[in-house]
UniProtKB/Swiss-Prot annotation:
Upper taxonomic lineage: Bacteria, Pseudomonadati, Pseudomonadota, Gammaproteobacteria, Enterobacterales
Subcellular location, principal: membrane
Domain of life: Bacteria
Membrane-spanning ranges: 30-50, 60-80, 110-130
Molecular function GO labels: succinate dehydrogenase activity
Keyword set, alphabetical order: Cell inner membrane, Cell membrane, Membrane, Transmembrane, Transmembrane helix
Pfam families the UniProt entry points to: Fumarate_red_C (PF02300)
Family according to the record: Belongs to the FrdC family.
Coiled coil feature spans: none
Topology of this chain in the membrane: Multi-pass membrane protein
Protein name listed in UniProt: Fumarate reductase subunit C
Job description of the protein: Two distinct, membrane-bound, FAD-containing enzymes are responsible for the catalysis of fumarate and succinate interconversion; fumarate reductase is used in anaerobic growth, and succinate dehydrogenase is used in aerobic growth. Anchors the catalytic components of the fumarate reductase complex to the cell inner membrane, binds quinones.
Amino acid sequence: MTTKRKAYVRTMAPNWWQQLGFYRFYMLREGTSIPAVWFSVLLIYGVFALKSGPAGWEGFVSFLQNPLVLFLNILTLFAALLHTKTWFELAPKAVNIIVKSEKMGPEPMIKALWVVTVVASAIILAVALL
């Protein structure tokens, strides 16, 4: 059966998400995937440069010293930190930890995740530099 009534279609502007801060932050957080793609491509390029020998590796290192590449890598670092912060704030909402018949607040878990991140980063950096 078909109807003769015209369906109501609510108009929505293309910039609807810019009206509320929550949606702007959501778009910013989701936009952190673009620098992650850049870093993934950069790592793949580095692996192939390493595979091609010393000359290829020297070319890769000189590519990394380009000011534009340095800027993109710093931007990627900030994007990764923002993404990490939002995921660490989300983790306590996904897990209910009960200690002495009381639900634990989110702060200890968030702090523990940051401590693990800093310790793991320090270990990786120490191994890379030694």
